[in-house]
Amino acid sequence: MASRFPKFSQGLAQDPTTRRIWFGIATAHDFESHDDITEERLYQKIFASHFGQLAIIFLWTSGNLFHVAWQGNFEAWVRDPLHVRPIAHAIWDLHFGQPAVEAFTRGGAPGPVNIAHSGVYQWWYTIGLRTNEDLYTGALFLLFLSAISLIAGRFHLQPKWKPSVSWFKNAESRLDHHLSGLFGVSSLAWTGHLVHVAIPESRGEHVRWDNFLDVLPYPRGLGPLFTGQWNLYAQNPDSSSHLFGTSQGAGTAILTLLGGFHPQTQSLWLTDIAHHHLAIAFVFFIAGHMYRTNFGIGHSIKDILEAHIPPGGLLGRGHKGLYNTINNSLHFQLGLALASLGVITSLVAQHMYSLPAYAFIAQDFTTQAALYTHHQYIAGFIMTGAFAHGAIFFIRDYNPEQNRDNVLARMLEHKEAIISHLSWASLFLGFHTLGLYVHNDVMLAFGTPEKQILIEPIFAQWIQSAHGKALYGFDVLLSSTNSPAFNAGQSIWLPGWLNAINDNSNSLFLTIGPGDFLVHHAIALGLHTTTLILVKGALDARGSKLMPDKKDFGYSFPCDGPGRGGTCDISAWDAFYLAVFWMLNTIGWVTFYWHWKHITLWQGNVAQFNESSTYLMGWLRDYLWLNSSQLINGYNPFGMNSLSVWAWMFLFGHLVWATGFMFLISWRGYWQELIETLAWAHERTPLANSVRWRDKPVALSIVQARLVGLAHFSVGYIFTYAAFLIASTSGKFG
């Protein structure tokens, strides 16, 4: 008999119902639960899958380069980055009528195309690419790397080349290699690329493999490095009249500390960026020698942790036992990695618009909005994943004996205090913020807007002033002309910083007022509530007041009736599930705030945000309704334009989102009735009844139905906002 799916679980493969398919898909990546899994095979499978992941990433980025080179207008865009719309790829659609063909034929293309809002044109331009040939070369190189990654993954699954468990658990060596090799070497290599290729290209000097060894990136070469005159590398930077991509106004410096932005491109100075990467490389080369390996230098992480015993004894046995706990738990390590990556991704979103690194990207408003929103959503999903794996760690990997009275055990022991404090913070933020908004709504509704409660964010304004923003008149630190830091800033370091922070044409330290104060606290409410749900889910994963015996029930047990006090909504999975809704709504508020504030800034009517953002009707009317009006006008052959597809996607996104609720408000008996009815109808329908299946149809489990609902809610939510964001921004600014 042919083996049935799933091969990794004999128990499931023999299941006579459709549960076999769904549970097979659900546990396909849960290697730990597979038949015949050993610790060694687990580590090797994950290691090999990393190469597969790299192959997919390289293939995807190669595809971006290839399609732009083939169907884009990169060379035309390079000649006039501010007025030519960058093309992502061509559209070939049988459904397009003549009005659609005309509406989507843009950017000098011969037929319908999609416009790129990803910033890849600006990125490739900044790093020195100039022709389609450059793009094709990059695509082929990445395709080669993709193939190498696939071969490497297959190679490391061969018996002779499988690494041992001890190799995977050698934390010090891995850290040293990742710090020095991954971060250090790649940062140094990137500095090299910027200095040898990107900076000369920005000054009109074309450097490629044929002349790479002949063109000195700095007139005196490595002389200043060996003679200790490093300051020479910063002398004669590009002038404020420099035209990017030409020699007009160009200097010779390669490593600078100018601060602020290039006046023409509105992006960070390339020579500052090169300097930054060189500094990072230096720091990481040192960091990569921090942990002791075979060479006898550096520290043992275990020794460091075991030495961490607080003198007063207030933290019990301190960090004893933590090294083995972390080193033997893949879920703990994944949780730490996801938490770090989530924070970094959110910081990337904040810095991409406030300190744009790519030439001319700051003037491409739709791209700025799309990139900010994209990175915040990615960060949200990654961070919720961190807590999910933290919860799985407590269920599968946590050993109370090994961690007796250390910081981890003590955190579990006072989890009630942690959870209740988070709860109080959330309640305080929620009631007070909503109270202020609602009060202001009532005052406007009753015709007394002067009675609004408007609170100036004075602490945040003081922090902005300390960084040099002079508008508020605080006269503190960098905004005080008497401060030594202010005077040094004019001459020694970052002379361009103070000009940039006080220039109203960029997004650096935006002016804030009462509307910002309110939405800041609304976002704080969302963050604290999301954190509360996630932290509670992880800390209660092994057992809670209601159900002290969760360990053997696993991560995602379903509702189980009133026995043991009822198990509804108390598995760690239930907490993750609820937290994702809060995460999405919180990021909704974050992106609404960012987008509305920037639209008014770009249009030159900041008063609209300042006046309308202090009450809820202002948000609904002047942000959501006003900016979606183009998307709810409908579409027809006469009014067809390039926003019509976004109008359709806006509708479609709402539909997917609403479908999610059908799966969320239900219980298992409902699904079983539904599937029985569908199966009955199918078997009695001509033609359809000639198709039979071997598996008996059974209902979705409660957890599965919730997952289907959550997936539709998330996808629909993001589709809806993506259409709104891109259409409302590109509709205004082209």
From Swiss-Prot:
TM stretches of this protein: 46-69, 135-158, 175-199, 273-291, 330-353, 369-395, 417-439, 517-535, 575-596, 643-665, 707-727
Annotated [4Fe-4S] cluster binding sites: 559, 568
Q: 4Fe-4S as a keyword? A: yes
Q: Where does chlorophyll a B1 bind?
A: 654
Q: Could you tell me the keywords of this UniProt record?
A: 4Fe-4S, Chlorophyll, Chloroplast, Chromophore, Electron transport, Iron, Iron-sulfur, Magnesium, Membrane, Metal-binding, Oxidoreductase, Photosynthesis, Photosystem I, Plastid, Thylakoid, Transmembrane, Transmembrane helix, Transport
Ligand binding (chlorophyll a B3): 662, 670
Write down the membrane topology: Multi-pass membrane protein
Under catalytic activity, the entry for this protein gives:
reduced [plastocyanin] + hnu + oxidized [2Fe-2S]-[ferredoxin] = oxidized [plastocyanin] + reduced [2Fe-2S]-[ferredoxin]
A GO BP entry: photosynthesis
Residues bound to phylloquinone are: 671
Query: What does the Swiss-Prot or TrEMBL cofactor note state?
Result: P700 is a chlorophyll a/chlorophyll a' dimer, A0 is one or more chlorophyll a, A1 is one or both phylloquinones and FX is a shared 4Fe-4S iron-sulfur center.
This chain's function reads:
PsaA and PsaB bind P700, the primary electron donor of photosystem I (PSI), as well as the electron acceptors A0, A1 and FX. PSI is a plastocyanin-ferredoxin oxidoreductase, converting photonic excitation into a charge separation, which transfers an electron from the donor P700 chlorophyll pair to the spectroscopically characterized acceptors A0, A1, FX, FA and FB in turn. Oxidized P700 is reduced on the lumenal side of the thylakoid membrane by plastocyanin.
Q: Subunit arrangement? A: The PsaA/B heterodimer binds the P700 chlorophyll special pair and subsequent electron acceptors. PSI consists of a core antenna complex that captures photons, and an electron transfer chain that converts photonic excitation into a charge separation. The eukaryotic PSI reaction center is composed of at least 11 subunits.
Family classification: Belongs to the PsaA/PsaB family.
Specify the protein name.
Photosystem I P700 chlorophyll a apoprotein A2
Source species of the chain:
Cycas taitungensis
